[in-house]
Amino acid sequence: MQPMPDRVPPRPHYFDVDFNVTPFTLAWEVTRACALACVHCRATAQPKRDPRELSPEEALRVVDQIVEMGKPILIVTGGDPLMRRDVFDIIRHASGKGLRVGLSPSATALATTQNLARAREAGVDMMHISMDGSCPEVHDAFRGVKGSFQRTLEVMNSVRELGIPLQVGTTVSRYNIGDLPAIAERVASVGARVWSVFFLVPTGRGQMSDMVSPREHEATFNWLYDLSRTASFAVRTTAAPHYRRVVIQRTRQAQPSGGGVEWELTGAGYAFREGRAPRDQGVNDGKGFCFISHVGDIYPSGFLQVSAGNVREQPVAEVYRHSALFTALRNPALLKGRCGACEFRGVCGGSRARAYGLTGDYMETDPSCVYVPASVQSGPAA
């Protein structure tokens, strides 16, 4: 199979996107329907489609709204987006308008080689497949369906054979934190370009008791940093902006004198580049990221389910740029507690979704972070 041709212009450089105007990434939950019953599902997915979902005509108009924002990267997700028969029309319309499109299907009977090929021909640039364990015992327990692990491997193999760039997603919880090294080996073996590591936020079916501790977050961040130095794939994190702080700290340790090289925040993490100073530009809920639900509600992210509007009533660009919720989330001066006092608040800012899920206030301290800002004298989190 030949590599996929370049259909659209290259993604913009991370620093060239004004997050006050355009998100770097927009995720769109086109349906909540899914055949799986994942224990940590953000969407609390259901077996049948919701009759309130955006119609095919509304869906195409939403694509036009997204294009008018400045062409962020579009992630088509669910539930299982393959449960929508018009998903290929949505992808084709988005790709034809110049958007880079990622698809996040569930590894079910719908993820046939034929359907994956249809997505590729419609214009998908990347495929995201979840793997939450290195073996059936761990993964299938997560997914709630026996045989899901084997099906996941089959889908990944089909994606690779079709020449579609593969991103593997893993949700970190107390059930699989010890399995991460083995999962990383699987990620390499399937030829993934990116490993996206999500740190559980208590929303949907995800429970606070399933989360790893703050110290386990920190230890995992340092392990991921070490892994990223040698892995054949890029490492990215979701709902873990404090990983950026760890990367900066570890980079400073490795380059104590600077040597004329500064850290640069990019979509894939931190890279090095001569003569370019860092900016306070870190993607977070509502800051460089936007989420549209299956019924058109506009959220800062799928894990911070506080609606700022609906695409049926307002253009998504208007809500993202001007709503009180989104503008507050992009203002680090409004952060509270340790996050508000932290010298890394611009590039990190803590997970606003986790702060909301654990404290009820999306501007409060992210309780999963152990770091004590220089200006704060209290001890680290437990």
Locate the predicted segments by residue.
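Conserved alpha-helical substructure of the radical SAM core
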Residues: 2-126
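Short Fe-S-cluster ligation motifs
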Residues: 65-78, 365-382
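Residues embedded in well-ordered beta-strands within globular domains across many folds
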Residues: 75, 128, 196, 236-239, ...
